[in-house]
């Protein structure tokens, strides 16, 4: 499935940053190394619009095995988190492919997403109109936190 998504996006999964969505904080610790301070920070800010870059564990999906780091998300979206819970597995995530000349509605409207991608994906879930602002990316692999990209989320330190 991951390789199929990468073909659709025309990206190399070994070279591009991919993230996984986890259901809850306990499932995050299966796939990433989380110390007490980072755990408290994540507990305070998640679920929410953040991607935390953490050191990975050996339980990561195969496509991530040669990487030291992994992006972890726990979005404030009950649909995707419930799917991850029911699967009892993380879900790989990436942004939709977007070209500058395209209307942004094709990134946010489930009906338009289905119109554009319905022939090449198995399923489009209509969870309502989505937002276009990206997640805030926080690197937590060193001793100090680093905001790699300021997006929708404003990190509240504990």
For each feature predicted by the language model, list its residue ranges.
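Active-site-adjacent structural elements in enzyme catalytic cores
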Residues: 1-158
